[in-house]
Amino acid sequence: MTTTDDALPRWDVTDVHESFDARTFLDAMDRANADVARLEALFDERNIRATDPRPVTPEDGADADAVVTAFNEYLTHADITEAYIASFTTTDTFNERAEGLEAEFGMTAARTRPLTARLAAWVASLGVDELATVSPAVAEHHGPLAKLADRAEHQMSEVEEGLYAELVATGSTAWGQLQGVVTSQLTATVALPDGPQDLPITAVRGLASHADAAVRRAAYDAEMEAWPKVAAACAAAMNGVKGEANVVNRRRGWASPLDASLFANSVSRPTFDAMQAAVVDSLPAFRGWLRAKARLHGHEGGLPWYDLFAPLPFAPAEVTWDDGLEIVRHAFGSYGGSLAGMVDRAVDGRWIDAGPRPGKQGGAFCMPFVDDRSLVFLNWSGSVDSAQTTAHELGHAYHNTQLAHRTPLQRALPMALAETASIFCETLVVEEGLQRLQGKDRLALLDVDLQGSAQVVVDIHSRFLFETEVFTRRQRRTLGVSELNDLMRQAQQDAYGDGIDQATAHPYMWVLKPHYYGAHFYNWPYTYGLLFGLGLFAQYRQDPDRFRAHYDDVLSRAGIDSAEALAAVFGFDVTDRAFWDASIDVIRSRMTAYDELAAAL
């Protein structure tokens, strides 16, 4: 039973800096400060700020070239330094020095926020199309700068944006860090069959996919005992983050937090509405599947929460790390190209930190590091789902390899589009298995796949409902633990319905998910990514050669073009609900296959 990190790999960043005491690291911190100071001086020297509309001049072109070049130069080095620090803060929240350095770097980086606001106002004043005629740098960065110009319509005054940039480090950023620290350091006592055991909360949550029903229930009970210990602190953090977001969104002229989120993700409201309509109409089908899963586990009615991630009784035993890698390696190899070598490159290069341990944050993510190299963060539990998560995060790493030749301003990805490659790679693993397996093995894989789809469609919908209500109520007052718990239960009731045993619903999901502790909705973009990824995979299956001819370029342009423009490359109209219905139909077909296989048992 994999519960803690023993022999699993950890990433190695010592080739970049040997330690925080290394001269190279100290120089990198000094350089970040110096680069920001030079940027501030350059913006003042060139008077980069809102101006009266007028015809552009060659001097404007020279100013734009200088500013864009300097911004990219700063980000090239600063992004590496930030990732290096994060490689410690995310894996060891007990490391107080790393936490302090993260805060120090954050204060330096925050000084660029008002500069970005000034650049947005300046570009909007003169026109990005007009500036592109006199500035090669603007022409090269037309997409990101056009979006920046649009952002200028939703900015506070220059002074206010500058003040907010200074305050955010001690406001929402600090609140989010608090949630990460208190939850990552939490432990729980689990009544395991061989006796009680104290485990990091990340390892406890990993037991949700354990083969033994008694262990799953014990882990759930331990969670319910543990989360109240940090709930009050997390409620304060939630109120701080959402309260700040409401004020800033209002001062920036956004009609709602959702409008701000859609803009940040380069997704239009018609696209979002089409997707949401398809999601809501799919909920009854998901509820039916959850009840079918419940029957296979011997339950009547809805599925208990503690069995949401339960493997089927005949599912394969625990997947070893090496076997999980082989599953991903084989699936990536079926696609070919540079993706085929992604697993070995990440393993050999020690990009991956795989196992849970005390002080390590929960979840999984991938962050770009140096050149086209990434750092892949996992909490491997030994489940089949862990293998799919590994494929997902290595998909992000592959995406980063396709972005590496772009400038930092060109490769800043909105979340919805950042999920494109990760979902596609996860789907490769699922489809390869479905083609290879039959009978009970096929049913077991469908079970894992559909529980993932249910998370991204149904659970994410519950998170969206919850967060929407939190934003609304936070406009009037702060929310306590009991109220947040009630909102979470109601959101789960509305999304899951009779698909789960509502008596076992998880009221503390808002405590443990870091996604809530940010200004924007950190939920619906996952649904976008899943359904868009399924649409891409269908295109790949129809014409693999044509798909491969466009895919890498689309990935490299994810920070440049809108969601609608990227979809159009493959002939998709994402403003049309039919696209989203077709993607959900792929999931429905898997539910049908699940039911047929279950009936044949």
Language model regions located:
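A well-structured
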Residues: 1-313, 596-601
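C-terminal, non-catalytic "cap/extension" segments appended to globular domains
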Residues: 3-7, 14, 18-20, 138, ...
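Active-site recognition of the HExxH zinc-binding catalytic motif
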Residues: 253, 381-401, 422, 427, ...
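Long, K/E/R/D-enriched contiguous segments that form extended
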Residues: 295-340, 399, 445, 450-456, ...
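Short pre-active-site segment immediately N-terminal to the catalytic Zn-binding motif
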Residues: 316-321, 334, 369-391
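Catalytic zinc-binding patch centered on the HExxH motif and its immediate surroundings
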Residues: 317-319, 352-373
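Conserved helix-loop functional segments at active or binding sites
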Residues: 330, 334-341, 367, 396, ...
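Post-HExxH zinc-binding segment in Zn-dependent metallohydrolases
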Residues: 414-442, 449-455, 529
